[in-house]
């Protein structure tokens, strides 16, 4: 008799990153069967996520030793064995969506950098690799995709080109796997590389829970009767600890309110009434994958992503909220993502910079300059730990461009 299939939550988040149209979404579909531009943008009941999430089980065939995401080996027909469940995060590759990609990068435990064989290394390839470097992500596999569009000599040429491109970066020793996502060619080799080079991070379930919020929603349909209304839903990824149905939670920095003509933020507490992970309702949720948290909050507070960038945890156990920051700054030599090579000029006093911290983004006005240090006044406060990494972007022309990173100091 067949055993009842036990549901497992994803245990690792793997980013699909790279230049627009290099095949990230097609590759995610080849690995998971889910087209993330529509399906995973819906966490059931119409919850939309701008960054696509899709879960898959990585399985290994005990007979031929090849990897797949199918219960039956597509290569020899034997039953496969479960290795682990992973969540693929499909990040936008368009230059205008770089800050969205950075929010997703903060949740990635590893990444597949997708480079199309017909185009090679492009501006957003560089930008996404630098984003991974800035958020401190070292577990990288490179997929040289669309090999069906070029001849063998071109594939070898691209391979050498990529080797040169990653020298001196976090991806210097990353394996480069030639694949065709469209035809499923070499996908088993890519999965084997993911298993070898992107380990599941160790999480202590007894640490205070912390979840970074990516989206938030009002799931009530227009015209719902008052007695049928359900509370606001928060979507994000747990980075430590665990959350349970019935837990009291605090959300920081919380909700904005006006006082003496100034906008201030107030933390809010509520109760978890439901949890979704991998599209299923669960009693407990752990780090890995996207988690939907149903709350008792007024849905007015959560509609249209109003809660994005917040941090969720147990009352009194969350990091501090900052409306001013002191950063130890590391500037890049060149601006990342532009067609032409531009030198990164020093940061100036009174300059406005865009800061990404976890899933939060805020503008910061530079109020003080020191040696390798800056002080900023923030437009929107952030909840973060001392020592947290901050991605720093500057407006270059009409776009925000990565120019460096910093660490929060006391």
From Swiss-Prot:
Residues of the signal peptide: none
Chain sites annotated for binding Mg(2+) 1: 25, 48
Gene Ontology biological-process entries: formation of translation preinitiation complex
Residue ranges of the region described as G3: 90-93
PROSITE patterns named in the record: G_TR_2
Keywords associated with the record: GTP-binding, Hydrolase, Initiation factor, Magnesium, Metal-binding, Nucleotide-binding, Protein biosynthesis, Zinc
Binding site for Zn(2+): 61, 64, 73, 76
EC nos: 3.6.5.3
Region (G2) residue spans: 46-50
Region annotated G4, chain positions: 145-148
Cofactor: Mg(2+)
Assembly, per entry: Heterotrimer composed of an alpha, a beta and a gamma chain.
Entry's family note: Belongs to the TRAFAC class translation factor GTPase superfamily. Classic translation factor GTPase family. EIF2G subfamily.
Known function: eIF-2 functions in the early steps of protein synthesis by forming a ternary complex with GTP and initiator tRNA.
Protein name: Translation initiation factor 2 subunit gamma
Natural source organism: Thermococcus onnurineus (strain NA1)
Name of the gene: eif2g
């Amino acid at each position: 008799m067949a055993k009842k299939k036990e549901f497992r939550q994803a245990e690792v988040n793997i980013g699909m990153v790279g230049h627009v149209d290099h095949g990230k979404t097609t590759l995610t579909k080849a690995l998971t069967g889910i087209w993330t531009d529509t399906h995973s943008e819906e966490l059931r009941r119409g919850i939309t996520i701008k960054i696509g999430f899709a879960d898959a089980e990585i399985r290994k065939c005990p007979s031929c030793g090849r990897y797949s995401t199918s219960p039956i080996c597509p290569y020899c027909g034997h039953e496969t064995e479960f290795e682990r469940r992973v969540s693929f995060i499909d990040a936008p590759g368009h230059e205008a969506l770089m800050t969205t990609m950075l929010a997703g990068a903060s949740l990635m435990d590893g990444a597949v950098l997708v480079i199309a064989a017909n185009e090679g290394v492009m501006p957003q390839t560089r930008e996404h690799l630098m984003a991974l470097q800035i958020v401190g992500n070292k577990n990288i596999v490179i997929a040289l995709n669309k090999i069906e569009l070029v001849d063998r000599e071109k594939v070898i040429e691209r391979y050498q080109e990529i080797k040169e491109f990653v020298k001196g970066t976090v991806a210097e020793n990353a394996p480069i796997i030639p694949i065709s996502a469209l035809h499923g060619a070499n996908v088993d080799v890519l999965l084997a590389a993911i298993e070898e080079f992107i380990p599941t991070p160790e999480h202590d379930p007894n640490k205070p829970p912390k979840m970074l919020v990516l989206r938030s929603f009002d799931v009530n349909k227009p015209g719902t009767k008052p007695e049928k209304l359900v509370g606001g839903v928060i979507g994000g990824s747990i980075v430590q600890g665990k959350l349970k149905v019935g837990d009291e939670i605090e959300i920081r920095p919380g909700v904005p309110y006006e006082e003496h003509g100034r906008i201030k933020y107030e933390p809010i507490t509520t109760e978890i009434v439901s949890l979704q992970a991998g599209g299923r309702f669960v009693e407990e949720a752990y780090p890995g994958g996207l988690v939907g948290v149903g709350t008792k909050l007024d849905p007015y507070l959560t509609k249209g992503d109003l809660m994005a960038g917040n941090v969720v945890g147990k009352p009194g156990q969350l990091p501090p909220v900052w409306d001013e920051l002191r950063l130890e700054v590391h500037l890049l030599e060149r601006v990342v993502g532009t067609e032409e090579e531009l030198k990164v000029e020093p940061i100036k006093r009174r300059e406005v910079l865009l800061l990404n911290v976890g899933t939060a983004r805020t503008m910061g006005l530079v109020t003080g300059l020191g040696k390798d240090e800056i002080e900023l006044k923030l437009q929107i406060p952030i909840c973060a730990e001392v020592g947290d990494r901050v991605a720093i972007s500057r407006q270059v022309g009409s776009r925000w461009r990565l120019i460096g990173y910093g660490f929060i100091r006391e």
